[in-house]
């Protein structure tokens, strides 16, 4: 008797759904002119407005700053966006200080 488990075709890989912060980040960057970039605080504010409840304070966006950075790193590693320092793309695994982001240029 032969084992046919290796002959079965592989199921097509479906990309994992994006994190809601990543969706807002990509949507925000898509609205910018091609020569512009966004600060992480801009994206955190946009996401905070979606999540806002009447009892939330005006600094709600600060809760989401870390999530924005994590998703930006993830998207940069995947080649979907660029993380910029002084207007130049940087390694998403090794950057510090003030940074911005933009959609990956083709």
Language-model regions, residue ranges each:
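Short, positively charged loop/turn segments that connect secondary-structure elements
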Residues: 48-70
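A generic structural signal for short
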Residues: 14, 28, 59-61
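Positively charged, polyanion-binding regions of nucleic-acid-associated proteins
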Residues: 16-41
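Intrinsically disordered, low-complexity serine/threonine- and proline-rich regulatory segments
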Residues: 1-19
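Hydrophobic alpha-helical segments that drive targeting, anchoring, or assembly
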Residues: 34-47, 71-74, 92
